[in-house]
Amino acid sequence: MYQPDFPPVPFRLGLYPVVDSVQWIERLLDAGVRTLQLRIKDRRDEEVEADVVAAIALGRRYNARLFINDYWRLAIKHQAYGVHLGQEDLQATDLSAIRAAGLRLGVSTHDDMEIDVALAARPSYIALGHVFPTQTKQMPSAAQGLEQLARHVERLADYPTVAIGGISLPRAPAVIATGVGSIAVVSAITQAADWRLATAQLLEIAGVGDE
C-alpha cells in the first residue's frame, strides 16, 4: 500500500527529463514537460544556489514538479517541489528535515536490496535503474533490462515508479509497456539532433503525468 512518509506524487509522473542546467529546465517547461529534475554534480552548495533558485522559480511559474538532485538543504531553503537522492546519499541526509519542510522525496534503486532500503524510507516515488547501459554516468551495477524492470514494477504495484538509464526514443514504448509510471531520460533529449521533436515524441509515449 502506498503510504509515503513524505507528500505523495501522482502515480504516473510521465516524461521525466533529468538535466544539468536552468537553460534546459526552461526549454523543457516551455515544450510542455511537467516533471523534471535538476542534477548538478560535484559542486558546493554556494556554487549551485543561484541555479537551484532559478529552477525552482521556473517550476512554480509553470506549475511543474521540479525535483532537485542531492542538494537537499537548498531544496528545503527555497521550497522546491521535491528532492531526489541516490542510495549513497540517504544515510548522509536529514530525511526528517525534508519531511518537515513538506518536500516530496524520490530515491534511486538498482536491485531488490536497494528497493528494500528505499521502501524503509517510505519516499514519494522510487526510481528503478539502470534499465539499459548508459553513458551518462558511471554505474557500479549491471543494466537490469526490461524483464527485471517489469518484475520490480510488479513488486511495487502500488507505488509511483520511475524507470531510468539508457532509455532512448526507440526503447521508450517497451519501457512504458512494463507498467512503470514514468521514464526518466537524459541524452534522449539533450543529445538529440532535434530536441524539440524528441521531447514531443517522448511526451506522446510517456505523457505529462497525472494531475
Curated annotation (Swiss-Prot):
GO terms for biological process: thiamine biosynthetic process; thiamine diphosphate biosynthetic process. Pathway: Cofactor biosynthesis; thiamine diphosphate biosynthesis; thiamine phosphate from 4-amino-2-methyl-5-diphosphomethylpyrimidine and 4-methyl-5-(2-phosphoethyl)-thiazole: step 1/1. Its EC number is 2.5.1.3. 4-amino-2-methyl-5-(diphosphooxymethyl)pyrimidine binds at residues 37-41, 69, 108, 137. Mg(2+) binds at residues 70, 89. It catalyses: 2-[(2R,5Z)-2-carboxy-4-methylthiazol-5(2H)-ylidene]ethyl phosphate + 4-amino-2-methyl-5-(diphosphooxymethyl)pyrimidine + 2 H(+) = thiamine phosphate + CO2 + diphosphate; 2-(2-carboxy-4-methylthiazol-5-yl)ethyl phosphate + 4-amino-2-methyl-5-(diphosphooxymethyl)pyrimidine + 2 H(+) = thiamine phosphate + CO2 + diphosphate; 4-methyl-5-(2-phosphooxyethyl)-thiazole + 4-amino-2-methyl-5-(diphosphooxymethyl)pyrimidine + H(+) = thiamine phosphate + diphosphate. One of its GO terms (molecular function) is thiamine-phosphate diphosphorylase activity. One of its GO terms (cellular component) is cytoplasm. 2-[(2R,5Z)-2-carboxy-4-methylthiazol-5(2H)-ylidene]ethyl phosphate binds at residues 134-136, 166, 186-187. Binds 1 Mg(2+) ion per subunit. InterPro entries: Aldolase_TIM, ThiamineP_synth_sf, ThiamineP_synth_TenI, TMP_synthase. Its cofactor is Mg(2+). Pfam families: TMP-TENI (PF02581). Keywords: Magnesium, Metal-binding, Thiamine biosynthesis, Transferase. It comes from the Bacteria. Condenses 4-methyl-5-(beta-hydroxyethyl)thiazole monophosphate (THZ-P) and 2-methyl-4-amino-5-hydroxymethyl pyrimidine pyrophosphate (HMP-PP) to form thiamine monophosphate (TMP). PANTHER family: THIAMINE-PHOSPHATE PYROPHOSPHORYLASE, THIAMINE-PHOSPHATE SYNTHASE. Belongs to the thiamine-phosphate synthase family. This is Thiamine-phosphate synthase. It comes from Shigella dysenteriae serotype 1 (strain Sd197).
